[in-house]
């Protein structure tokens, strides 16, 4: 039988793995070799594999140590398949991020339950580290789904307690109530998902069979917990939503810059208490009475206004950046894809004119899918109107305009004010283009190479100036303004 062997113990509230596989069990569950115990938390031999156990009780001498840092990889959205000599399969599904644990309850899988599934050593035996003859393996502890669930529950509970911020009401309760909370949460979900069916993709890694299970309820779970977690669109890792804002919406796992709302960007860039918004009451009136077979344009505008709390896809106003007075406009991709309609164009134009009259430096943060098709030529006209206002600001008044391109910046915004900055800054891995990949391929009947519209590729083509991550962005802008003779008032 192919097996993942591990023993665990709770020590000072954290989960530690100490004992690996160096033991074989015959078909009647009798130990035939000693299990070594090591205090070394480092994995000694990562290249060794656990081989199939034949009828003659052959064994492998592979030791796998799993430290706290490796727990995430060991129990993170994977299904471990255990196959016995009769080709029966017993699967264990982990999803630590959504707190899901499933064991297939197929009678054919449980028929070989009498053979030992896992070797277990109690905490006292691990603590003593006895080198004498091993005591008989207590197979009754893990020959039922219930006892195995209890063991995994304690592992998951300990891991959550040491690695994830659990609500204080859970942590402050007793061990029993905490176990009960986790148990009911995990197994309640697993029972429901088992009833609704699933599909799986079978893979093999290092000689051991794995199955990545895709439940039909995955989408429902994502929707259910999206108020708690934000999924990275690059590595698909989950980031805790409460902590994401303090980390500037940067993925913990891969450092990818996730989308930010316009309000969060303003809070990031502008000194506290200095933000003064402009034209907040300006709304679109469906100027061309756009006909839609689905949702009417006015209803769609109202829906996005309720969803985002904004009147349209841009916020404009004045404030101070490290004490320097500035005018700033920030587009919001959450409002109809940041599309540029008549209201967006008018608000940006008024902001530029105000900055021109007040001799203020200007920042425009771009995040847009382009012109808004529901407003037709009026939307396209905003490109020329904004560009004309910028020409007066830059060429006649000799003032300083910084354009910041975030992901995505496409269409009419790229073709107008997005590329007119005196300094054009891009965020890492930002998607920047005029036409999207699919549109180009369908129009020209040519394949667009992957990554050819990413900021790092376009930087080497000279499309913009620096690529600046969010962390130092405010300091970089402050230095640029000082270089162009804009200084703090205090």
Swiss-Prot record:
One of its GO terms (cellular component) is chloroplast stroma. Pathway: Lipid metabolism; malonyl-CoA biosynthesis; malonyl-CoA from acetyl-CoA: step 1/1. InterPro entries: AcCoA_carboxyl_beta, Acetyl_CoA_COase_Trfase_b_su, ClpP/crotonase-like_dom_sf, COA_CT_N. Keywords: ATP-binding, Chloroplast, Fatty acid biosynthesis, Fatty acid metabolism, Lipid biosynthesis, Lipid metabolism, Metal-binding, Nucleotide-binding, Plastid, Transferase, Zinc, Zinc-finger. Its cofactor is Zn(2+). Binds 1 zinc ion per subunit. It is found in: Plastid, Chloroplast stroma. A zinc finger (C4-type) spans 232-254. Residues 228-490 form the CoA carboxyltransferase N-terminal domain. It catalyses: N(6)-carboxybiotinyl-L-lysyl-[protein] + acetyl-CoA = N(6)-biotinyl-L-lysyl-[protein] + malonyl-CoA. Pfam families: Carboxyl_trans. One of its GO terms (biological process) is malonyl-CoA biosynthetic process. Disulfide bonds: none annotated. It is an enzyme of class 2 (transferase). One of its GO terms (molecular function) is carboxyl- or carbamoyltransferase activity. Zn(2+) binds at residues 232, 235, 251, 254. Its EC number is 2.1.3.15. Its main location: plastid. HAMAP family: AcetylCoA_CT_beta. PANTHER family: ACETYL-COENZYME A CARBOXYLASE CARBOXYL TRANSFERASE SUBUNIT BETA, CHLOROPLASTIC (PTHR42995:SF5). Component of the acetyl coenzyme A carboxylase (ACC) complex. Biotin carboxylase (BC) catalyzes the carboxylation of biotin on its carrier protein (BCCP) and then the CO(2) group is transferred by the transcarboxylase to acetyl-CoA to form malonyl-CoA. Acetyl-CoA carboxylase is a heterohexamer composed of biotin carboxyl carrier protein, biotin carboxylase and 2 subunits each of ACCase subunit alpha and ACCase plastid-coded subunit beta (accD). Belongs to the AccD/PCCB family. This is Acetyl-coenzyme A carboxylase carboxyl transferase subunit beta, chloroplastic.
């Amino acid at each position: 039988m192919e097996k993942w062997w591990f023993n665990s113990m709770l020590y000072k509230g954290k989960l530690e793995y100490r004992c690996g596989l160096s033991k074989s069990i015959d078909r009647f569950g009798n130990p035939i070799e000693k299990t070594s115990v090591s205090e070394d938390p480092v994995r000694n031999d990562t290249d060794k594999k656990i081989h199939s156990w034949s009828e003659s009780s052959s064994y492998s001498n592979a030791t796998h140590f799993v430290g706290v840092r490796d727990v995430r990889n060991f129990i993170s959205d994977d299904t471990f398949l255990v196959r016995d000599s009769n080709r029966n399969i017993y699967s264990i599904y982990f999803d630590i991020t959504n707190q899901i644990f499933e064991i297939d309850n197929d009678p054919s899988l449980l028929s070989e339950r009498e053979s030992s599934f896992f070797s277990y050593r109690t905490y006292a035996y691990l603590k003593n580290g006895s080198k004498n003859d091993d005591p008989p393996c207590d197979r009754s502890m893990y020959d039922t789904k219930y006892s195995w669930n209890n063991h995994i529950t304690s592992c998951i509970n300990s891991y959550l307690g040491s690695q994830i911020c659990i609500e204080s009401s859970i942590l402050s309760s007793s061990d029993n109530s905490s176990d009960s909370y986790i148990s009911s949460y995990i197994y309640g979900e697993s029972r429901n998902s088992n009833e609704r069916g699933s599909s799986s993709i079978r893979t093999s890694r290092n000689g051991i069979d794995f199955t990545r299970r895709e439940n039909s309820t995955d989408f429902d779970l994502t929707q259910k917990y999206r108020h708690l977690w934000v999924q990275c669109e690059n590595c698909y890792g989950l980031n805790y939503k409460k902590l994401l804002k303090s980390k500037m919406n940067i993925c913990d796992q891969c450092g990818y810059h996730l989308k930010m709302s316009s309000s969060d960007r303003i809070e990031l860039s502008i000194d506290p208490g200095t933000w003064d918004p402009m034209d907040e009451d300006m709304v679109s009136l469906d100027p061309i009475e756009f006909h839609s077979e689905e949702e009417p344009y006015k209803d769609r505008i109202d829906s996005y206004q309720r969803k985002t709390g904004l009147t349209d896809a841009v916020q404009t106003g004045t404030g101070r950046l490290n004490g320097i007075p500035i005018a700033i406009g920030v587009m919001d991709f959450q409002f109809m894809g940041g599309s540029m309609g008549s209201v967006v164009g008018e608000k940006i134009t008024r902001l530029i004119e105000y900055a021109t009259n007040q001799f203020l430096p200007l920042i425009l943060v771009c995040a847009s899918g382009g012109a808004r098709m529901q407003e037709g030529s009026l939307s396209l006209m905003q490109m020329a109107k904004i560009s004309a206002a910028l020409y007066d600001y830059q060429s006649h008044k000799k003032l300083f305009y910084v354009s910041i391109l975030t992901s995505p910046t496409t269409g009419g915004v790229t073709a107008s004010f997005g590329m007119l900055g005196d300094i054009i800054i891009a965020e890492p891995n930002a998607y920047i283009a005029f036409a999207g990949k699919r549109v180009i391929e369908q129009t020209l009947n040519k394949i667009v190479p992957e990554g050819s519209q990413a900021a790092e590729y376009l930087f080497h083509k000279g499309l913009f100036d620096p690529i600046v991550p969010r962390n130092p962005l405010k300091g970089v802008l402050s230095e640029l303004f000082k270089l162009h003779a804009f200084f703090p008032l205090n």
